[in-house]
Amino acid sequence: MAPATQPNVKWAERRGDTGGAAIASLPTPPPAQPARYALQPNLSVVAGERGGLLLCLRPLLALRLNRQATTLLGALRQPRSVAELAASVPGMTPAAITAFLDRLLRRRLLIRRPAEMTVWPQVTIIIPAHGRAEATRRCVQSLLALDYPADHREIIVMDDASTPPLAEALRDLPIRLLRQERNIGQSAARNLAATMASGTVLAFIDNDCVAEPDWLRGLLPYLDDPSVAMIGGRVVAPPARGAVAAFEAVRSPLDMGATDAEVTPNAAVSYLPTCNLLVRRDVLLAHGGFDATLRVGEDVDFIWRTLRNGHRAWYVPAGRVVHDHRVRWGDWLRRRADYGSSEADLQQRYPEGWRVMHLPRISLLLLLSVMLTPWFGFWGLGPAAVALSLFSAELTKKQRELRRVGVTLSIGRVAVALGREHAAALYHLSANAVRYYSLPLLVIGGIQPSGLPAILLLLIVAPLADHRRLRPQLSLLVFIGLYGLELVAYQVGLWRGCRQRRTLRPLLPRLIWRR
Protein backbone atom coordinates (compact mmCIF):
# COMPACT_ATOMS: atom_id res chain seq x y z
CA MET A 1 0.00 0.00 0.00
CA ALA A 2 1.17 3.55 -0.64
CA PRO A 3 2.42 5.67 2.22
CA ALA A 4 -0.33 7.71 3.84
CA THR A 5 -0.41 11.37 2.82
CA GLN A 6 -2.86 13.37 4.92
CA PRO A 7 -3.70 16.94 3.86
CA ASN A 8 -4.19 18.30 7.38
CA VAL A 9 -0.59 18.32 8.57
CA LYS A 10 0.46 21.37 10.52
CA TRP A 11 4.13 22.33 10.31
CA ALA A 12 6.14 23.69 13.20
CA GLU A 13 9.69 24.53 12.13
CA ARG A 14 12.38 24.52 14.79
CA ARG A 15 15.83 26.05 15.09
CA GLY A 16 18.39 24.02 13.16
CA ASP A 17 15.72 22.61 10.83
CA THR A 18 16.48 21.99 7.15
CA GLY A 19 13.11 23.39 6.15
CA GLY A 20 12.19 20.21 4.38
CA ALA A 21 14.66 20.75 1.55
CA ALA A 22 16.30 17.60 0.28
CA ILE A 23 20.00 17.32 1.05
CA ALA A 24 22.06 15.77 -1.70
CA SER A 25 23.61 12.51 -0.64
CA LEU A 26 27.34 12.75 -0.34
CA PRO A 27 29.53 10.54 -2.48
CA THR A 28 31.05 7.83 -0.33
CA PRO A 29 34.78 7.28 -0.89
CA PRO A 30 36.34 3.87 -0.47
CA PRO A 31 36.24 2.92 3.22
CA ALA A 32 39.40 3.26 5.27
CA GLN A 33 39.15 -0.40 6.23
CA PRO A 34 36.93 -2.91 4.43
CA ALA A 35 34.54 -5.34 6.10
CA ARG A 36 36.31 -8.10 8.00
CA TYR A 37 35.27 -11.63 8.94
CA ALA A 38 36.28 -13.95 11.78
CA LEU A 39 35.25 -17.32 13.17
CA GLN A 40 32.90 -17.42 16.12
CA PRO A 41 35.05 -17.89 19.25
CA ASN A 42 33.61 -21.35 20.04
CA LEU A 43 34.75 -22.78 16.67
CA SER A 44 38.05 -24.33 15.68
CA VAL A 45 39.51 -25.58 12.41
CA VAL A 46 41.27 -28.95 12.44
CA ALA A 47 43.48 -29.43 9.36
CA GLY A 48 44.15 -32.84 7.77
CA GLU A 49 45.85 -34.27 4.68
CA ARG A 50 42.74 -34.14 2.46
CA GLY A 51 41.07 -31.12 3.98
CA GLY A 52 39.87 -30.43 7.46
CA LEU A 53 37.05 -30.07 9.91
CA LEU A 54 35.14 -27.16 11.39
CA LEU A 55 34.56 -28.25 14.98
CA CYS A 56 32.34 -26.97 17.77
CA LEU A 57 31.54 -28.73 21.05
CA ARG A 58 28.74 -26.43 22.21
CA PRO A 59 26.56 -27.20 20.35
CA LEU A 60 28.14 -30.31 18.87
CA LEU A 61 29.03 -29.59 15.25
CA ALA A 62 31.53 -31.14 12.87
CA LEU A 63 31.61 -29.97 9.23
CA ARG A 64 33.98 -31.52 6.72
CA LEU A 65 35.99 -29.02 4.69
CA ASN A 66 37.92 -29.29 1.46
CA ARG A 67 41.46 -27.92 1.29
CA GLN A 68 40.45 -24.46 0.09
CA ALA A 69 37.79 -24.08 2.78
CA THR A 70 40.23 -25.32 5.42
CA THR A 71 42.83 -22.75 4.38
CA LEU A 72 40.24 -19.98 4.21
CA LEU A 73 38.63 -20.69 7.58
CA GLY A 74 42.01 -21.26 9.19
CA ALA A 75 42.90 -17.71 8.18
CA LEU A 76 39.77 -16.46 9.96
CA ARG A 77 41.19 -17.16 13.40
CA GLN A 78 42.02 -13.46 13.05
CA PRO A 79 39.72 -10.92 11.33
CA ARG A 80 40.37 -10.81 7.58
CA SER A 81 38.93 -8.92 4.64
CA VAL A 82 37.81 -10.62 1.43
CA ALA A 83 40.83 -9.17 -0.38
CA GLU A 84 43.20 -10.62 2.23
CA LEU A 85 41.51 -14.01 1.98
CA ALA A 86 41.69 -13.99 -1.83
CA ALA A 87 45.43 -13.38 -1.60
CA SER A 88 45.91 -16.32 0.78
CA VAL A 89 43.63 -18.85 -0.94
CA PRO A 90 44.73 -19.51 -4.55
CA GLY A 91 42.00 -20.39 -7.01
CA MET A 92 39.11 -18.62 -5.24
CA THR A 93 37.80 -15.34 -6.59
CA PRO A 94 36.59 -12.58 -4.26
CA ALA A 95 33.02 -13.25 -5.44
CA ALA A 96 33.27 -16.96 -4.58
CA ILE A 97 34.80 -16.17 -1.19
CA THR A 98 32.05 -13.64 -0.44
CA ALA A 99 29.33 -16.17 -1.33
CA PHE A 100 30.96 -18.84 0.86
CA LEU A 101 31.33 -16.47 3.80
CA ASP A 102 27.74 -15.33 3.36
CA ARG A 103 26.48 -18.92 3.72
CA LEU A 104 28.44 -19.32 6.95
CA LEU A 105 27.15 -15.99 8.23
CA ARG A 106 23.58 -17.17 7.74
CA ARG A 107 24.40 -20.20 9.90
CA ARG A 108 25.88 -17.89 12.55
CA LEU A 109 29.32 -19.51 12.24
CA LEU A 110 31.13 -16.25 11.46
CA ILE A 111 31.33 -12.73 12.81
CA ARG A 112 31.26 -9.86 10.30
CA ARG A 113 32.60 -6.46 11.20
CA PRO A 114 31.50 -3.83 8.68
CA ALA A 115 33.70 -1.38 6.86
CA GLU A 116 34.76 1.73 8.72
CA MET A 117 32.81 4.73 7.49
CA THR A 118 34.67 7.87 6.44
CA VAL A 119 31.59 9.84 5.36
CA TRP A 120 28.40 9.47 7.36
CA PRO A 121 25.07 9.46 5.49
CA GLN A 122 22.28 11.97 5.99
CA VAL A 123 19.89 10.42 8.53
CA THR A 124 16.35 11.45 9.41
CA ILE A 125 15.23 10.25 12.83
CA ILE A 126 11.46 9.81 13.03
CA ILE A 127 9.50 9.73 16.30
CA PRO A 128 5.74 9.08 16.10
CA ALA A 129 4.17 10.49 19.25
CA HIS A 130 0.70 10.48 20.79
CA GLY A 131 0.81 12.12 24.20
CA ARG A 132 3.59 11.38 26.73
CA ALA A 133 5.07 14.86 26.43
CA GLU A 134 7.77 14.37 29.09
CA ALA A 135 8.87 11.04 27.62
CA THR A 136 8.95 12.56 24.12
CA ARG A 137 11.18 15.36 25.36
CA ARG A 138 13.56 12.88 27.02
CA CYS A 139 13.71 10.90 23.78
CA VAL A 140 14.52 14.00 21.71
CA GLN A 141 17.16 15.15 24.19
CA SER A 142 18.89 11.78 23.90
CA LEU A 143 18.91 12.16 20.12
CA LEU A 144 20.39 15.66 20.31
CA ALA A 145 23.19 14.17 22.44
CA LEU A 146 24.07 11.47 19.89
CA ASP A 147 27.69 11.06 18.88
CA TYR A 148 26.82 11.88 15.27
CA PRO A 149 27.49 14.93 13.06
CA ALA A 150 24.67 17.42 13.71
CA ASP A 151 24.68 18.57 10.08
CA HIS A 152 24.07 14.98 8.96
CA ARG A 153 21.01 14.26 11.07
CA GLU A 154 17.48 15.57 11.12
CA ILE A 155 14.90 14.88 13.85
CA ILE A 156 11.19 14.77 13.00
CA VAL A 157 8.58 14.40 15.73
CA MET A 158 5.19 13.44 14.31
CA ASP A 159 2.59 14.67 16.83
CA ASP A 160 -0.32 12.33 16.12
CA ALA A 161 -3.17 14.45 17.53
CA SER A 162 -1.79 14.63 21.06
CA THR A 163 -3.94 16.38 23.68
CA PRO A 164 -2.51 18.79 24.65
CA PRO A 165 -0.25 19.29 21.60
CA LEU A 166 3.45 18.57 22.04
CA ALA A 167 4.58 21.97 20.74
CA GLU A 168 4.89 23.51 24.21
CA ALA A 169 6.96 20.61 25.61
CA LEU A 170 9.34 20.68 22.62
CA ARG A 171 9.37 24.40 21.83
CA ASP A 172 13.04 25.05 22.67
CA LEU A 173 14.47 21.97 20.91
CA PRO A 174 16.04 22.11 17.40
CA ILE A 175 13.72 19.65 15.66
CA ARG A 176 10.98 19.56 13.04
CA LEU A 177 7.59 19.09 14.63
CA LEU A 178 4.70 17.97 12.41
CA ARG A 179 1.20 17.78 13.84
CA GLN A 180 -1.84 15.77 12.82
CA GLU A 181 -5.18 17.12 14.01
CA ARG A 182 -6.73 13.66 13.63
CA ASN A 183 -5.13 10.52 15.05
CA ILE A 184 -3.92 8.31 12.19
CA GLY A 185 -1.88 5.73 14.12
CA GLN A 186 1.84 5.04 14.37
CA SER A 187 2.22 3.38 10.98
CA ALA A 188 0.60 6.18 9.00
CA ALA A 189 2.51 8.75 11.08
CA ARG A 190 5.82 7.06 10.25
CA ASN A 191 4.91 6.87 6.56
CA LEU A 192 3.94 10.53 6.41
CA ALA A 193 7.13 11.64 8.11
CA ALA A 194 9.16 9.44 5.73
CA THR A 195 7.75 11.26 2.70
CA MET A 196 8.92 14.57 4.19
CA ALA A 197 12.32 13.37 5.35
CA SER A 198 15.54 14.71 3.85
CA GLY A 199 17.76 11.80 4.83
CA THR A 200 18.77 8.86 2.69
CA VAL A 201 18.46 6.67 5.80
CA LEU A 202 15.43 6.70 8.10
CA ALA A 203 15.97 5.90 11.78
CA PHE A 204 12.79 5.00 13.66
CA ILE A 205 12.51 5.26 17.42
CA ASP A 206 9.48 5.46 19.72
CA ASN A 207 8.85 8.28 22.17
CA ASP A 208 9.07 5.92 25.15
CA CYS A 209 12.71 5.17 24.26
CA VAL A 210 16.02 6.87 24.99
CA ALA A 211 18.89 6.34 22.54
CA GLU A 212 22.39 5.61 23.79
CA PRO A 213 25.03 8.08 22.47
CA ASP A 214 26.57 5.65 19.93
CA TRP A 215 23.19 4.42 18.62
CA LEU A 216 23.61 5.52 14.99
CA ARG A 217 27.37 4.92 14.84
CA GLY A 218 26.78 1.37 16.03
CA LEU A 219 24.27 0.54 13.28
CA LEU A 220 24.94 2.60 10.16
CA PRO A 221 28.21 0.88 9.12
CA TYR A 222 26.24 -2.33 8.47
CA LEU A 223 24.52 -0.61 5.56
CA ASP A 224 27.86 -0.84 3.72
CA ASP A 225 26.38 -3.96 2.10
CA PRO A 226 24.03 -2.72 -0.67
CA SER A 227 21.85 -5.83 -0.30
CA VAL A 228 21.04 -4.88 3.30
CA ALA A 229 18.08 -2.50 3.49
CA MET A 230 17.23 -2.67 7.20
CA ILE A 231 19.24 -2.74 10.41
CA GLY A 232 17.82 -3.15 13.89
CA GLY A 233 19.55 -2.63 17.21
CA ARG A 234 19.02 -3.95 20.69
CA VAL A 235 16.13 -2.78 22.89
CA VAL A 236 17.04 -2.92 26.58
CA ALA A 237 15.13 -2.05 29.73
CA PRO A 238 15.85 0.64 32.34
CA PRO A 239 16.65 -0.41 35.92
CA ALA A 240 13.75 -2.57 37.07
CA ARG A 241 11.23 -1.39 39.65
CA GLY A 242 8.71 -4.07 40.48
CA ALA A 243 8.12 -7.66 39.42
CA VAL A 244 6.74 -6.97 35.93
CA ALA A 245 9.61 -4.58 35.15
CA ALA A 246 12.17 -7.17 36.30
CA PHE A 247 10.47 -9.79 34.12
CA GLU A 248 10.38 -7.49 31.08
CA ALA A 249 14.06 -6.71 31.55
CA VAL A 250 14.89 -10.30 30.54
CA ARG A 251 11.81 -11.49 28.60
CA SER A 252 10.72 -8.53 26.49
CA PRO A 253 9.75 -9.58 22.93
CA LEU A 254 11.51 -6.40 21.75
CA ASP A 255 14.94 -7.56 22.94
CA MET A 256 16.53 -9.85 20.34
CA GLY A 257 19.57 -10.73 22.43
CA ALA A 258 23.31 -10.15 22.41
CA THR A 259 24.30 -11.85 19.13
CA ASP A 260 24.40 -10.44 15.58
CA ALA A 261 22.07 -12.28 13.22
CA GLU A 262 20.49 -12.06 9.81
CA VAL A 263 16.73 -11.57 10.00
CA THR A 264 14.52 -14.13 8.25
CA PRO A 265 11.14 -15.69 9.09
CA ASN A 266 11.50 -18.65 11.47
CA ALA A 267 15.13 -17.78 12.25
CA ALA A 268 16.56 -17.02 15.69
CA VAL A 269 15.79 -13.36 14.91
CA SER A 270 12.67 -13.25 12.76
CA TYR A 271 11.76 -9.54 12.85
CA LEU A 272 12.96 -6.13 14.04
CA PRO A 273 10.84 -3.83 16.23
CA THR A 274 10.20 -0.33 14.90
CA CYS A 275 11.36 1.32 18.13
CA ASN A 276 14.94 0.69 16.96
CA LEU A 277 15.03 0.35 13.19
CA LEU A 278 17.08 1.89 10.39
CA VAL A 279 15.78 1.63 6.81
CA ARG A 280 16.99 2.95 3.49
CA ARG A 281 14.45 5.63 2.59
CA ASP A 282 14.15 4.63 -1.07
CA VAL A 283 13.42 1.02 -0.07
CA LEU A 284 10.72 2.00 2.42
CA LEU A 285 8.96 4.24 -0.09
CA ALA A 286 9.31 1.70 -2.91
CA HIS A 287 7.57 -0.99 -0.85
CA GLY A 288 4.73 1.11 0.52
CA GLY A 289 5.97 1.78 4.02
CA PHE A 290 4.15 0.39 7.04
CA ASP A 291 0.64 -0.98 6.67
CA ALA A 292 -1.53 1.70 8.29
CA THR A 293 -4.42 -0.76 8.73
CA LEU A 294 -2.40 -2.67 11.35
CA ARG A 295 -2.21 -1.38 14.92
CA VAL A 296 -0.01 -4.29 16.02
CA GLY A 297 2.35 -6.50 14.03
CA GLU A 298 3.09 -3.73 11.52
CA ASP A 299 6.83 -4.10 12.14
CA VAL A 300 6.79 -7.83 11.32
CA ASP A 301 4.64 -7.17 8.25
CA PHE A 302 7.01 -4.52 6.88
CA ILE A 303 10.15 -6.56 7.54
CA TRP A 304 8.77 -9.73 5.94
CA ARG A 305 7.31 -7.84 2.97
CA THR A 306 10.65 -6.16 2.30
CA LEU A 307 12.54 -9.44 2.66
CA ARG A 308 10.12 -11.06 0.22
CA ASN A 309 11.12 -8.42 -2.33
CA GLY A 310 14.75 -9.49 -2.26
CA HIS A 311 16.28 -7.21 0.38
CA ARG A 312 18.10 -8.31 3.49
CA ALA A 313 17.96 -7.27 7.14
CA TRP A 314 20.38 -7.65 10.04
CA TYR A 315 20.09 -7.43 13.78
CA VAL A 316 23.06 -5.74 15.47
CA PRO A 317 22.96 -5.45 19.28
CA ALA A 318 25.62 -2.72 19.24
CA GLY A 319 23.09 0.06 18.51
CA ARG A 320 20.99 0.22 21.69
CA VAL A 321 17.96 2.12 22.90
CA VAL A 322 16.45 1.95 26.39
CA HIS A 323 12.72 1.23 26.23
CA ASP A 324 10.30 2.13 29.01
CA HIS A 325 8.28 -1.11 29.04
CA ARG A 326 4.65 -1.42 30.09
CA VAL A 327 4.81 -2.49 33.71
CA ARG A 328 1.22 -2.11 34.87
CA TRP A 329 -0.34 -5.53 35.06
CA GLY A 330 -3.34 -4.77 32.85
CA ASP A 331 -1.32 -2.91 30.20
CA TRP A 332 1.32 -5.64 30.16
CA LEU A 333 -1.13 -8.53 29.70
CA ARG A 334 -3.23 -6.65 27.13
CA ARG A 335 -0.12 -5.95 25.08
CA ARG A 336 0.88 -9.61 25.14
CA ALA A 337 -2.63 -10.55 24.00
CA ASP A 338 -2.39 -7.97 21.20
CA TYR A 339 0.88 -9.50 20.03
CA GLY A 340 -0.75 -12.93 19.96
CA SER A 341 -3.76 -11.63 18.01
CA SER A 342 -1.53 -10.46 15.14
CA GLU A 343 -0.05 -13.91 14.45
CA ALA A 344 -2.99 -15.33 12.47
CA ASP A 345 -3.04 -12.37 10.08
CA LEU A 346 0.73 -12.44 9.60
CA GLN A 347 0.83 -16.17 8.88
CA GLN A 348 -1.95 -15.80 6.31
CA ARG A 349 -0.04 -13.00 4.59
CA TYR A 350 3.33 -14.73 4.72
CA PRO A 351 3.29 -18.53 4.34
CA GLU A 352 7.09 -18.45 4.59
CA GLY A 353 6.60 -17.47 8.24
CA TRP A 354 4.76 -20.70 9.03
CA ARG A 355 5.99 -21.87 12.40
CA VAL A 356 8.26 -24.92 12.53
CA MET A 357 8.06 -27.26 15.52
CA HIS A 358 10.73 -29.91 15.99
CA LEU A 359 9.72 -33.19 17.63
CA PRO A 360 12.81 -34.75 19.26
CA ARG A 361 12.34 -38.53 19.52
CA ILE A 362 14.42 -39.01 22.66
CA SER A 363 12.63 -36.22 24.54
CA LEU A 364 9.22 -37.57 23.54
CA LEU A 365 10.18 -41.09 24.65
CA LEU A 366 11.25 -39.79 28.05
CA LEU A 367 7.97 -37.89 28.44
CA LEU A 368 6.07 -41.02 27.42
CA SER A 369 7.85 -42.95 30.17
CA VAL A 370 6.82 -40.34 32.74
CA MET A 371 3.21 -40.73 31.59
CA LEU A 372 3.19 -44.56 31.50
CA THR A 373 5.07 -45.35 34.71
CA PRO A 374 2.11 -44.59 37.06
CA TRP A 375 0.03 -47.11 35.07
CA PHE A 376 2.55 -49.84 34.33
CA GLY A 377 5.20 -49.38 37.00
CA PHE A 378 8.57 -50.83 35.97
CA TRP A 379 7.31 -51.67 32.47
CA GLY A 380 6.46 -48.01 31.93
CA LEU A 381 10.20 -47.36 31.79
CA GLY A 382 10.35 -49.13 28.41
CA PRO A 383 10.29 -45.90 26.35
CA ALA A 384 13.08 -44.49 28.54
CA ALA A 385 15.15 -47.61 27.85
CA VAL A 386 14.58 -47.12 24.12
CA ALA A 387 15.65 -43.47 24.47
CA LEU A 388 18.83 -44.54 26.27
CA SER A 389 19.58 -47.06 23.52
CA LEU A 390 19.10 -44.40 20.83
CA PHE A 391 21.38 -42.01 22.71
CA SER A 392 24.07 -44.69 23.09
CA ALA A 393 23.91 -45.57 19.40
CA GLU A 394 24.15 -41.90 18.44
CA LEU A 395 27.08 -41.40 20.81
CA THR A 396 28.95 -44.34 19.29
CA LYS A 397 28.28 -43.03 15.78
CA LYS A 398 29.50 -39.52 16.65
CA GLN A 399 32.66 -40.88 18.24
CA ARG A 400 33.36 -43.01 15.16
CA GLU A 401 32.78 -40.08 12.77
CA LEU A 402 35.10 -37.81 14.73
CA ARG A 403 37.87 -40.41 14.73
CA ARG A 404 37.43 -40.94 11.01
CA VAL A 405 38.27 -37.28 10.36
CA GLY A 406 41.18 -37.30 12.79
CA VAL A 407 39.59 -35.73 15.88
CA THR A 408 40.20 -37.53 19.17
CA LEU A 409 37.83 -36.64 21.99
CA SER A 410 37.05 -38.64 25.09
CA ILE A 411 33.72 -40.44 25.17
CA GLY A 412 32.79 -38.26 28.15
CA ARG A 413 33.27 -34.97 26.27
CA VAL A 414 31.26 -36.22 23.32
CA ALA A 415 28.52 -37.49 25.64
CA VAL A 416 28.28 -34.12 27.41
CA ALA A 417 28.14 -32.26 24.10
CA LEU A 418 25.48 -34.62 22.76
CA GLY A 419 23.52 -34.35 26.00
CA ARG A 420 23.49 -30.55 25.69
CA GLU A 421 22.15 -30.90 22.16
CA HIS A 422 19.25 -33.08 23.30
CA ALA A 423 18.58 -30.81 26.28
CA ALA A 424 18.32 -27.87 23.88
CA ALA A 425 15.86 -29.85 21.74
CA LEU A 426 13.71 -30.53 24.81
CA TYR A 427 13.87 -26.84 25.74
CA HIS A 428 12.59 -25.75 22.31
CA LEU A 429 9.80 -28.34 22.45
CA SER A 430 8.83 -27.04 25.89
CA ALA A 431 8.96 -23.39 24.77
CA ASN A 432 6.59 -24.18 21.88
CA ALA A 433 4.23 -26.09 24.16
CA VAL A 434 4.13 -23.35 26.81
CA ARG A 435 3.58 -20.60 24.26
CA TYR A 436 0.85 -22.22 22.18
CA TYR A 437 -0.69 -25.17 24.03
CA SER A 438 -0.31 -24.80 27.82
CA LEU A 439 -4.00 -24.13 28.50
CA PRO A 440 -5.41 -27.05 26.46
CA LEU A 441 -2.67 -29.35 27.80
CA LEU A 442 -3.59 -28.47 31.38
CA VAL A 443 -7.25 -29.12 30.61
CA ILE A 444 -6.28 -32.54 29.23
CA GLY A 445 -4.22 -33.17 32.38
CA GLY A 446 -7.22 -32.32 34.53
CA ILE A 447 -9.43 -34.73 32.60
CA GLN A 448 -6.79 -37.48 32.52
CA PRO A 449 -4.64 -37.07 35.68
CA SER A 450 -2.27 -39.88 34.71
CA GLY A 451 -0.92 -37.64 31.96
CA LEU A 452 -0.48 -34.62 34.22
CA PRO A 453 3.11 -35.40 35.40
CA ALA A 454 4.37 -35.58 31.80
CA ILE A 455 2.46 -32.40 30.88
CA LEU A 456 3.84 -30.50 33.87
CA LEU A 457 7.36 -31.69 33.08
CA LEU A 458 7.00 -30.56 29.47
CA LEU A 459 5.67 -27.14 30.51
CA ILE A 460 8.19 -26.48 33.28
CA VAL A 461 11.42 -27.12 31.31
CA ALA A 462 11.41 -23.80 29.41
CA PRO A 463 10.75 -21.47 32.38
CA LEU A 464 13.30 -23.34 34.53
CA ALA A 465 15.94 -23.08 31.81
CA ASP A 466 15.14 -19.41 31.15
CA HIS A 467 15.41 -18.53 34.83
CA ARG A 468 18.85 -20.13 34.94
CA ARG A 469 19.94 -18.63 31.60
CA LEU A 470 18.54 -15.10 31.95
CA ARG A 471 19.17 -14.62 35.69
CA PRO A 472 16.27 -12.24 36.39
CA GLN A 473 16.04 -10.24 39.60
CA LEU A 474 13.11 -12.46 40.61
CA SER A 475 12.71 -15.62 42.63
CA LEU A 476 12.13 -18.80 40.68
CA LEU A 477 8.47 -19.09 41.74
CA VAL A 478 7.64 -15.47 40.85
CA PHE A 479 9.40 -15.83 37.49
CA ILE A 480 7.49 -19.02 36.65
CA GLY A 481 4.21 -17.37 37.65
CA LEU A 482 4.82 -14.34 35.42
CA TYR A 483 6.03 -16.63 32.63
CA GLY A 484 2.75 -18.52 32.76
CA LEU A 485 0.61 -15.36 32.93
CA GLU A 486 2.43 -13.84 29.97
CA LEU A 487 1.86 -16.85 27.76
CA VAL A 488 -1.75 -17.37 28.85
CA ALA A 489 -2.40 -13.78 27.72
CA TYR A 490 -0.58 -14.49 24.46
CA GLN A 491 -2.69 -17.61 23.84
CA VAL A 492 -5.94 -15.74 24.53
CA GLY A 493 -4.90 -13.14 21.95
CA LEU A 494 -3.82 -15.87 19.54
CA TRP A 495 -7.21 -17.60 19.70
CA ARG A 496 -8.93 -14.25 19.28
CA GLY A 497 -6.90 -13.59 16.14
CA CYS A 498 -7.61 -17.10 14.82
CA ARG A 499 -11.33 -16.55 15.31
CA GLN A 500 -11.23 -13.16 13.59
CA ARG A 501 -9.21 -14.48 10.64
CA ARG A 502 -11.06 -17.83 10.60
CA THR A 503 -7.90 -19.89 10.56
CA LEU A 504 -6.08 -22.34 12.84
CA ARG A 505 -2.78 -21.95 11.01
CA PRO A 506 -0.83 -20.54 14.01
CA LEU A 507 -1.82 -23.61 16.04
CA LEU A 508 -0.86 -26.10 13.32
CA PRO A 509 2.91 -25.85 12.83
CA ARG A 510 5.03 -27.67 10.32
CA LEU A 511 6.29 -30.70 12.25
CA ILE A 512 9.83 -32.00 11.78
CA TRP A 513 11.04 -35.16 13.51
CA ARG A 514 14.47 -35.04 15.10
CA ARG A 515 16.65 -37.75 16.55
Short names for language-model regions:
Residues 2-75:
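Acidic, low-complexity/disordered tracts enriched in E/D and polar residues
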Residues 58-60, 65-67, 72, 87-142:
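N-proximal low-complexity "stem/linker" segments adjacent to membrane-targeting elements
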Residues 141-152:
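Short, acidic, metal-binding catalytic loop of nucleotide-sugar glycosyltransferases
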Residues 156-167, 182, 209:
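A conserved acidic beta->alpha catalytic loop
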Residues 167-196, 228, 254:
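Conserved donor nucleotide-binding strand/loop of the catalytic core
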Residues 180-197, 207, 261-270, 275:
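Glycine-rich, basic loop-to-helix element that forms the pyrophosphate-binding segment
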Residues 202:
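Short aromatic/hydrophobic "clamp" motif used to bind/position activated sugar donors
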Residues 214-246, 324:
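Conserved donor NDP-sugar-binding/catalytic core segment of glycosyltransferases
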